[in-house]
Amino acid sequence: MNTEVIAIIPARFASSRFPGKPLADMLGKSMIQRVHERIAGVVPRAVVATDDERIRQAVEDFGGEVVMTSPECSSGTERCREAFDKVGRGEKIVLNLQGDEPFIQKEQIDLLISAFDKPETDIATLAEVFSSDASFERLNNPNSPKIVLDHGGYALYFSRSVIPYLRGVQPDSWCRRHTYYKHIGIYAFRPTVLRKITSLPQSTAEQAESLEQLRWLEYGYRIRVLQTQQSTIGIDTPEDMDKAIAYLRSQGME
């Protein structure tokens, strides 16, 4: 394990689409426990950052490391920064891993960390290619932000809308005619950059799309995007949870 890496898992109880999501039961374990167990098997430290006593107690009950953060944090990255300032031990890379990704793969975490083999990398994230047979309905889902990349693998823009627009092509054919990238919302930062980007005021594009990474782009920070071959099952709604539990059962992970 790379001892210069710490993973922080922001977890909020309040959610407009799925209140109490971190503590939702997944066949005998809470979602936050399943997330923590996956990550703790890959990196030397995995710390849950929360502002809710119920989550703190649940994490302590299963033996995980947890830190309380301010309820005033406006984003997961702000919560990640506050947690690192409180419990960091001089690690060189800070991972911000979502508390609603219980199926995150070891290969994805390793890939994210590998971005920092290049000294010019300050921020890294992952993307997955939409399959060529993906429907326009799936592509157009605003809960699956899309990314446009430059030739060097850095993000030009993130959007909940479909970008780019294929002029003169029927929407159901877009994924066959163009390579679209789905953002997987996990990040890695150098600590100095994490502190800088969380000190910036919100940007106009960030406010419009409700995507905090647009703030970093608007202020001139570069985000390196690595392509993963593994799919994940993010959980945004109770319906997503039903699918996740069905997947657990199908894999004999009860």
UniProtKB/Swiss-Prot annotation:
**InterPro entries, per the entry:** Cytidylyl_trans (IPR003329), KdsB (IPR004528), Nucleotide-diphossugar_trans (IPR029044)
Instruction: Tell me which EC number(s) this protein carries.
Output: 2.7.7.38
- Listed GO MF terms: 3-deoxy-manno-octulosonate cytidylyltransferase activity
Which Pfam families does the protein's record reference? CTP_transf_3
As for subcellular location, the record says: Cytoplasm
Main localization, broad class: cytoplasm
Q: A cellular component term (GO) from this record?
A: cytosol
Name its GO BP terms in alphabetical order: CMP-keto-3-deoxy-D-manno-octulosonic acid biosynthetic process; lipopolysaccharide biosynthetic process
Is Cell membrane tagged as a keyword?
A: no
Q: Which UniProt keywords apply?
A: Cytoplasm, Lipopolysaccharide biosynthesis, Nucleotidyltransferase, Transferase
First-level EC class: transferase
Signal peptide residues are: none
Its pathway is: Nucleotide-sugar biosynthesis; CMP-3-deoxy-D-manno-octulosonate biosynthesis; CMP-3-deoxy-D-manno-octulosonate from 3-deoxy-D-manno-octulosonate and CTP: step 1/1; Bacterial outer membrane biogenesis; lipopolysaccharide biosynthesis
Give the reactions, separated by semicolons, that this protein catalyses: 3-deoxy-alpha-D-manno-oct-2-ulosonate + CTP = CMP-3-deoxy-beta-D-manno-octulosonate + diphosphate
Instruction: Tell me the function of this protein.
Output: Activates KDO (a required 8-carbon sugar) for incorporation into bacterial lipopolysaccharide in Gram-negative bacteria.
Give the family from UniProt. Belongs to the KdsB family.
The cross-references to HAMAP family, in alphabetical order and at most eight, read:
KdsB (MF_00057)
The protein, known as = 3-deoxy-manno-octulosonate cytidylyltransferase
Q: Which organism is it from?
A: Porphyromonas gingivalis (strain ATCC 33277 / DSM 20709 / CIP 103683 / JCM 12257 / NCTC 11834 / 2561)
